[in-house]
Amino acid sequence: TYYANLIMQELDERNEPPSKTFEYINRFARFVAEHNGAAYECRVTHVPLTEQVRAVVLEPPFGSNITVLEDAKTRALLVIDSGFRCCARYTLRQLRTIFPDFDERKREMLLTHSDSDHTGLAESMPVIWCSQRTADCFANESLGLPSPREASATGLPYYRLNKLITEYAVPPLNRLRILNTSHGDDEQPISPIGAFLFGDMRFNVLQGNGGHVPGETMLIDPVHRVAFTGDDYINPHNMTPPQKEFDRLAPYLARSVNVDSPRYHAILRAVLAMLDGKGYLIFPGHGGVVQRTEAM
């Protein structure tokens, strides 16, 4: 009721009819209910990356892509982002079908950022890698403080309702492991903060300066030409019909998917300059994998 009242107050101040926004909230909740449970279907893509590592990408009807890297030698798994928490058991069911011994394997998670549509499997992961700023965000949330998206009066009610509808919970703080070996340079759109090893791959870990959300990170393997961009680059040209429908709802409710749109566009330009046309296999935060021969 409190957050609904905040929305009513905001709409009244802007002379906008509350019925329109609450209809979108109703459609958002109905969409989540109708595409969850037995109706939760992911587009699954299997992609070999190196002689030792392969990727399996799950694209749910709503929420972030869920990418699992598998090390053929050690059988270890790395889960990069993981959709919404309200879908967790159905995501796990699909992962256990692909990897029948999923629960027995060494498995870790890596979060590209703190948004609720990326953290859904956090409670099922023994280790969760993230940037220091992402960890700080979770620590603040655990104390009841607003996330970066809730810092504004306009963002607070919408994101709190989103979290309620999608059953968000702060990831377990005692499982967080920090990617940073340096702080990065916020004078630049993207800057290096460390490195991450998995199998025979070595990723440069880059951090954006807070365009999409503070703590946003990307993983770039320049040797094997593989990039995980989080939401600093998404692929709207190759989404499933449910994903497209959901994406039409979310920005209206949140007003913007970015904390700082000018910074986000500077980050996107830097990402395009670094990757586009250079033979990278690109795994976006949302939408299909961009093949090496495709333009971003």
Regions from the language model: what does each represent?
Residues 73, 96-103, 273-279:
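Alpha-helix termini
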Residues 77-79, 108-109, 127, 227, ...:
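Hydrophobic "anchor" residues on beta-strands that sit immediately upstream
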